[in-house]
């Protein structure tokens, strides 16, 4: 069914209780559509009520008009249901000066969910909006403070920080040039400032011995 001429018509659709009314703007003539309560079915098990034309009367309504009706009905009922939960809380917070009317949900932590038609609350309808608390900020600052306390030992030459005095003394050998650790291999005599570096160097001699021994076995 095509809509012939354009006319801004404010129609009223009665909900199930026949008390809630809302305007819908669409382009059609009043004679082309008749809105009756029995033309629409209500789904009480869903969180939001939507107006769905029944099969016996759906041929009377154009497809474009069906989309407009369902969209307006969804927006109306969703806005009404949201206002039931948030109007009281927002008005109290606005009156006390804790929040601004522009951002009413800025300081709201939890909004209780309304019961749906089957008597169970929707677990996804609760809203949690919170700012970082003082406890979290304290923990972060404590972590940085403890990290600063760990580096208590500083080099007097390059100002590098270390956690223990042993690490600092080991670092000072770089500046002084001390090499107290000598390679125990015969004929090597190479000196190192760190013991682990000396051990690592000594393993190279042991690996050379193993390689030479394997070559001798292979040749024999």
From Swiss-Prot:
Tagged with keyword Signal: no
Zinc finger motifs (C2H2-type), residue ranges: 153-175, 181-205
Example of a GO biological process term: negative regulation of pseudohyphal growth
Keywords: DNA-binding, Metal-binding, Nucleus, Repeat, Repressor, Transcription, Transcription regulation, Zinc, Zinc-finger
InterPro entries: Znf_C2H2_sf, Znf_C2H2_type
GO molecular function annotations of the record: DNA-binding transcription factor activity, RNA polymerase II-specific; RNA polymerase II cis-regulatory region sequence-specific DNA binding; sequence-specific DNA binding; zinc ion binding
Keyword Transcription regulation: yes
Entry's localization field: Nucleus
This protein's GO CC annotations: chromatin; nucleus; transcription regulator complex
Misc. comment: Present with 704 molecules/cell in log phase SD medium.
Protein name, per record: Probable transcriptional regulator NRG2
Upper lineage: Eukaryota, Fungi, Dikarya, Ascomycota, Saccharomycotina
């Amino acid at each position: 069914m095509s809509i012939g001429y354009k006319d801004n018509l404010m129609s009223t659709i009665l909900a199930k209780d026949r008390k809630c009314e809302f305007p819908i703007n669409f382009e059609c003539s009043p004679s082309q559509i008749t809105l009756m309560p029995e033309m629409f079915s209500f789904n009480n098990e869903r969180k939001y009520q939507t107006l769905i034309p029944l099969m016996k009367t759906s041929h009377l309504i154009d497809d474009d008009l069906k989309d407009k009706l369902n969209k307006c009905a969804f927006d109306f009922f969703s806005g009404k249901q949201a206002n039931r939960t948030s109007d009281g809380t927002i008005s109290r917070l606005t009156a006390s000066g804790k929040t601004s009317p522009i951002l009413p949900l800025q300081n709201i932590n939890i909004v209780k969910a309304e019961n749906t038609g089957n008597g169970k609350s929707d677990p996804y309808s609760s809203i949690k909006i919170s700012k970082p608390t003082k406890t979290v900020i304290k923990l972060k600052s404590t972590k940085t403070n403890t990290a600063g306390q760990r580096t208590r030992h500083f080099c007097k030459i390059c100002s590098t920080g270390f956690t223990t005095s042993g690490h600092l003394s080991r670092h000072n050998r770089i500046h002084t040039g001390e090499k107290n650790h000598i390679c125990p291999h015969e004929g090597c005599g190479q000196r190192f400032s760190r013991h682990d570096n000396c051990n690592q160097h000594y393993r190279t001699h042991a690996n050379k011995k193993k390689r030479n021994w394997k070559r001798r076995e292979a040749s024999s």
